[in-house]
From Swiss-Prot:
It comes from the Bacteria. Cell division protein that may be involved in stabilizing or promoting the assembly of the division complex. Belongs to the FtsQ/DivIB family. DivIB subfamily. This is Cell division protein DivIB. Residues 47-288 are extracellular. The chain crosses the membrane at residues 26-46. Residues 253-288 are annotated as: Disordered. Residues 253-263 have a biased composition (Basic and acidic residues). The gene is divIB.
Amino acid sequence: MEKVIDITERVPAMKKRRRRRTNFKFLALVTIFLFIIIILLYFQLPYSDIKKIDIKGAALKEDTYYIDQSNLKINDSLWGFKISEVEQAIAQHEWVKSVTVERKFLNEVQITVEEWQKVAYISQDGEFYPMLDNGIVFEESNEIVPIDAPIFRDFENEALRKKLLKELANLKPEVLSLISQINANPTEADPYSITLFMNDGYEVRADANTLAEKLNYYPSIIAQIESEDVSEKGIVDIEVGSYYRPFSDEYTLIKENTEKTEEPAEETENADTEEGGQLEEQNEEEPE
């Protein structure tokens, strides 16, 4: 037979459970209230103001430039701006590839800028302007001859320049650092013909369309040349295949071609001189 529990025995337990439930609700309400008070105080007091603006990834421009472009200032409200608007203000510059703005901790803003890579310089009016891998010429110049990237000379063709910039961006960093100067020497047969002058003393003839594909093998090509005890530096031609000839052979060939070109001109000049002399003799023999 089941035991019958008197209601008077259950009352204390019920009161205890009710008291616990009431205390829990009270604590929850107090916690929420305190949390709201803290948030209100945070927004009202200087703790929610910007105390630091951190710029990461800037190379072409100073950190202060990007801070000015963001329109953010120290002691502005950390929550008083839209992230998308700040990102748009910085990303509108053609040398900026991407930008990310983040609120850090309780009073910091971090702006991460990814710029287009500088791959070369172009010489204009005695100054050197950085060229980026998206094809643009950066607005700020340098009067000092740069050593951190190759220099473009005689690149009047914009299509050729942009094509070459893309190829340089695909080069291995260790190969790109070996290039000192690049000259454009287009012809009707090959409008993309270029000449590269390397820091190690060699000269490379190449086609801009296939430069990255072939020039990435440059270190191994030079290693093979020097392993054959070649005592003279020269020209590495990778326009079609890949072959090497010393500078002395190249200059001898140029000299011979120049002499062959000059010989017909000299013969013509001599013939004209002889013909002129014969005419003078005939004029002297004619009676007055």
